Structures are given as C-alpha cells and as structure tokens.
Design a protein with these regions (language model features):
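Short hydrophobic/Thr-rich beta-strand motif most characteristic of the beta2 strand and flanking loop
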Residues: 28-35, 43
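Acidic catalytic/metal-coordinating carboxylates
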Residues: 35-39, 62-65
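Conserved acidic segment of CheY-like receiver
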Residues: 4-15, 20-24, 52
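Active-site residues of response regulator receiver
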Residues: 55
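Short amphipathic alpha-helix used as the core "switch/output" element in two-component signaling
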Residues: 42, 64-76
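Non-catalytic signal-transmission and effector/linker regions of two-component phosphorelay proteins
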Residues: 1-6, 107-142
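Receiver (REC) domain active-site loop signature in two-component systems and cognate sites
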Residues: 58
Length: 142
C-alpha cells in the first residue's frame, strides 16, 4: 500500500477550507488545514508536505507570498493558488497552477493535484509500470 500524500490546505474562509479538506480526505490524501499563511509556514517547516493548496487573499501572509516562501525552502514542492480575482494571476506568481474560485469543478482540482504529485515523484520505474498495468487489468475485470 502506497503512503498517503500530504497536502497543506490554506484558506482564511473556514467553510471553504472545510469543504476542500473533506474532498481531499475522501480521495485518500492526508490534509493539514491552516487558516492563515503564518500557520501554514510553520506547518511546512515541520516537513512532510507533498503539495500546497492555498487561497490568494488572506490577512497577513497572502497565498502568493506563502508560495514564494515555500518555494524558497523547497523549490520542488508543487503549489496550487486559488482566487476569486482572475486579474490577480496576471502578476508574477510562483504557483504551478492557478484556479479561479467558482470557475472550476472539483474534478479539475483533483486532477491538477494528481498530475502535480506525479510530476514531483518523477516517471515510474519499469517495475511500477508493470504493476500498475496489472492492477488496471484486474480493475477492469472486476
């Protein structure tokens, strides 16, 4: 059984944070939820984070600054930035993916996260490819 990937999920809106946390946990991810950028930086520094998912507009350390700090500490850590303000993304950001609130389906967010985590891990080794092909074959029979 492969270990769960850990996602640092950050939003000052408790309802949005809760919804994303539940959605990610039901897909098998471990989620560390933080309500501000300062908490998120502390959590990231403790280690074990595979991906960062953050809102842009937050008091104190905003999402763009949070991603900048995280990329300084760990450039390979993928980051997803979410905002209700599309124009904001036109400024320079270190986020790997930008999604506009209300303009994406949950399935799109989940797929973007999956792809970023695969890229971080790197290509599968030949043995992993054989195992995943066998797993897919068995799944289609079931």
């Amino acid at each position: 059984m492969k270990p769960k990937k850990t996602i640092l999920c950050v939003d000052d809106n408790e309802q949005a944070l809760s919804i994303r946390k539940i959605m990610l946990e039901t897909r098998g991810y471990r989620v560390l939820a933080c309500s501000n950028g300062e908490q998120a930086l502390e959590a990231f520094r403790r280690g074990g984070i595979d991906l960062v998912l953050t809102d842009l507009i937050m008091p104190g350390v905003d999402g763009s600054r949070l991603i900048e700090e995280i990329k300084n500490l760990s450039p390979q850590t993928p980051a997803v930035l979410i905002s209700g303000r599309i124009k904001i993304y036109e400024r320079e950001t270190l986020a790997d993916v930008f999604l506009s609130k209300g303009m994406y389906e949950p399935a799109e967010l989940l797929e973007r996260i999956r792809v970023l985590l695969v890229r971080k891990r790197g290509p599968k080794r030949p043995a992993e490819l054989r195992h995943s092909a066998v797993d897919e074959e068995h799944a289609s029979v079931a």
